[in-house]
Amino acid sequence: MAQKQKCVAMLLAGGKGSRLSALTKNLAKPAVPFGGKYRIIDFTLSNCANSGIETVGILTQYQPLELHNYIGIGNAWDLDRVSGGVTVLPPYAESSGVKWYTGTASAIYQNLNYLSQYEPEYVLILSGDHIYKMDYSKMLDYHIEKESDVSISVIEVPWDEASRFGIMNTNEEMEIVEFEEKPQFPRSNLASMGIYIFNWSILKEYLEMDARNPESSNDFGKDVLPLLLDEGKKLMAYPFEGYWKDVGTVKSLWEANMDLLRDETSLNLNDRNWRIYSVNPNEPPQYIAEKAKVEESLINEGCVIEGDVKHSVLFQGVTVEEGSMVIDSVVMPGAKIGKNVVIERAIVGSEMVIEDGTIIRPEKNVDDVVLIAEGK
């Protein structure tokens, strides 16, 4: 019998991330590189570790191999525990065949046995594909104080973007009175961050109810949360005011990387009180040639810079040869940039080779971002 836990986290990491195009052709979205030396999933796992959440189930599905290898037993995040720790939970086969996760609620439902062994009071449900730093223990305290059945973390988004999110309409006490999934005409700009705390008994009851409904799409936002509201359960919105970015598109991923280069940013990766942990490869120090120029950039281990790099993020093992310029760009691990190349407002994928004399920049709209990548 597993040791009883007050709160167990379930991290949804099976997303395909189709809007990231070639970056996720052979890679799960949470495993996409970010910020010079991280993967997207590092932020959620580090938040768990820093918040004192010691038991984390990671639900994987799409292209899971590299993600599984990266997570390992969770030691990079101090989550390799005798009791609890990290457990990877892919779909599994029953006598009737393999049961794929058909939605966010389906994924948790198929792992109720995993949760039951810990007899938790609360279950924290997370997404593995957002960039943010958050103390989940404060949200749990809020949930308990408000005597809520479900608490949902929300953040104010620009009104012109509200129709892209699940929107919470609340009363003055922040109790949720209506949930609208991507409304055409939103009445609030409080967007769901995809972070939920459920009382365990409520979660179990309503997931079992949802699984019995043949018309359900087995999704929290579309099915489970509206049902809870219809039945009068208490749902509270937990306001979050820090940095949060949904990096589901090429442009938003680029923007989040560029945010790291700003003088004033709430996403401080050097915060000693809230470290973001990662699995770092062993690479030699970066080499910057005498004639090279580097300005306002993150240059990581193993890079060889002989050209000019300005306001860019370069991952480990990147080469920029003589005469080349990299401006306002993200260059992922192992990419080789030849001589006299110009790269501007672009993301260059892992292990890409950019031939001598190539020019890469937006052709039509100067606000666009170019993606140069291919599946492995």
Curated annotation (Swiss-Prot):
Positions with a binding annotation for alpha-D-glucose 1-phosphate: Y101, G166, E181, K182, S192
A molecular function (GO) term: ATP binding
Keywords: ATP-binding, Carbohydrate metabolism, Glycogen biosynthesis, Glycogen metabolism, Nucleotide-binding, Nucleotidyltransferase, Transferase
Enzymatic reactions: alpha-D-glucose 1-phosphate + ATP + H(+) = ADP-alpha-D-glucose + diphosphate
InterPro entries, per the entry: ADP-Glc_PPase, ADP_Glu_pyroP_CS, GlgC_bac, GlmU/GlgC-like_hexapep, NTP_transferase_dom, Nucleotide-diphossugar_trans, Trimer_LpxA-like_sf
EC class of the enzyme, as a word: transferase
Function: Involved in the biosynthesis of ADP-glucose, a building block required for the elongation reactions to produce glycogen. Catalyzes the reaction between ATP and alpha-D-glucose 1-phosphate (G1P) to produce pyrophosphate and ADP-Glc.
Protein name: Glucose-1-phosphate adenylyltransferase
Organism: Bacillus cereus (strain ATCC 14579 / DSM 31 / CCUG 7414 / JCM 2152 / NBRC 15305 / NCIMB 9373 / NCTC 2599 / NRRL B-3711)
